[in-house]
């Protein structure tokens, strides 16, 4: 191989790597969501769908919803992201917890104490009961459920801030009732999903 050919190959390789890097950067551009009243914010990949308070319905499409109608904000993976797998949906959500009669909890203990009327159920994790997010300590709970061959797993995080009870959640649904069975996420896909949701969760912060 002469020097001219070698130089040409190096140039082609460099251009290809630069193009791939540029595509990767654009695919992972970051957007910031700020609550209408400015009380909180978080960051998320711009390719994900985000729905805000009062306009949550477009983010509710899976058999078991991963966004609640009363959410303050909800971010979901696009359906095509993991096509042809058994993943139903994945989301990060922010809610304000209210008790029966739309009465807010009046203190931190009431905010994080499991309540029979909670939907989803909030059961404090024995293995990992607390998580620091945005400099604030949240109580960590879990919830799961099944419905007609579909299942959901949720990690819930609650904190009492400025006289309001906030709940952050990361939810994943999947199905196992198809014939033939759909494939599960590959290890790289699972890692991508886990890291993305964790990054969104830990980007959350209160504005005051």
For every predicted segment, state its role:
Residues 25, 53-57, 128-136:
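Short, ordered beta-strand-loop transition motifs
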